[in-house]
Amino acid sequence: MIAKSIVDCIGGTPLVQLARLYDGRKAEVFAKLEMLNPAGSIKDRPARYIIERGLAEGSIAPGTHIIESSSGNLAIALAMVCRIKGLRFTAVVDPKISPTNLKILRCYGAGIERVTRKDSQGGYLETRIERVRQMLASEPGAVWINQYGNPRNWESHFHGEGDEIARALDRPADMLVLGVSTSGTVLGIARRLRREWPGLRVVAVDAVGSVLFGAKPGPRELPGIGASRVPELLCRDDIDDVIHVDDYDAAMGCRRLLEREGIFAGGSSGAVVVAIDRLLARATRPLRIVTLLPDRGERYLDSVYDDEWLARIAASRAGGAVSAASPSLHVPSLEEVL
């Protein structure tokens, strides 16, 4: 099949059994490789879905200025889609944006609007949204994607990965285990799969320091999981359990995934691996689990896959100062893991 544009290559990602990480006699774990989308992440799906439906219905006009609060994957996905659709795009970002993501956005020609003031939760999300509202007020024709409250976010995953997983598996899964941030992914896929498998148990994987499920805000560094603000989309009734994973454990989960499966994935994928480990540790029977690996590891070379960064995170968790070479706390290097 010949695609008309790179946007038409979004979706249809493979579902892979993680048979080297998990013994099939104790668990079958299937992971959808969303990092294989053209712009490198699961966020390609809502970016395409929201833009194309907006253009089709007229809520987005040709040449419209699209604005979104994102320092990561959605910003990159929107930059790609807007480039193909002839739209102008500005990403509202904060100081936590990685140098790699900033360079990618600029390569796509995206505008960059940066905030520096922290919000009431100690993060930047509220401040970024405030800046978005200011931009909309000064440019009435602009359109805010609003991944936190736009129902087309979860609809894109309902009709995307949800449909694809339902078609791919020959029998029901016991659990859906997914990282959560805006909550669009987990809600969309859970709602679709529960049509097929009403007994499906949905487990959200959240970051330590995230406020999504009522915990107090705290420091966290990895993007793509957790939030400093509860999104309008979040419906806790669709979620059965929540597992919190900190940055260090998530990074170690990524390294295990790379070591055992050869899958070079981003931080939230490692958090999911850790969550599945915890679930299986208390399982009383073999389980069939479905998950997603949302993005590529290349965007985390300065964090998850950097030994000095990992040593700093380990020191913070231990409450002291430590380097990667410190004898007081052994932090395995990437070479040791591999």
Swiss-Prot record:
Pathway: Siderophore biosynthesis. Its cofactor is pyridoxal 5'-phosphate. GO terms for biological process: cysteine biosynthetic process from serine. It comes from the Bacteria. Keywords: Plasmid, Pyridoxal phosphate, Transferase. Its EC number is 2.5.1.140. The modification N6-(pyridoxal phosphate)lysine is found at residue 43. One of its GO terms (molecular function) is transferase activity, transferring alkyl or aryl (other than methyl) groups. It catalyses: O-phospho-L-serine + L-glutamate = N-[(2S)-2-amino-2-carboxyethyl]-L-glutamate + phosphate + H(+). Homodimer. Catalyzes the synthesis of N-((2S)-2-amino-2-carboxyethyl)-L-glutamate (ACEGA) from O-phospho-L-serine and L-glutamate. This is N-(2-amino-2-carboxyethyl)-L-glutamate synthase. It comes from Ralstonia nicotianae (strain ATCC BAA-1114 / GMI1000). The lineage of its organism: Bacteria, Pseudomonadati, Pseudomonadota, Betaproteobacteria, Burkholderiales. The gene is sbnA.
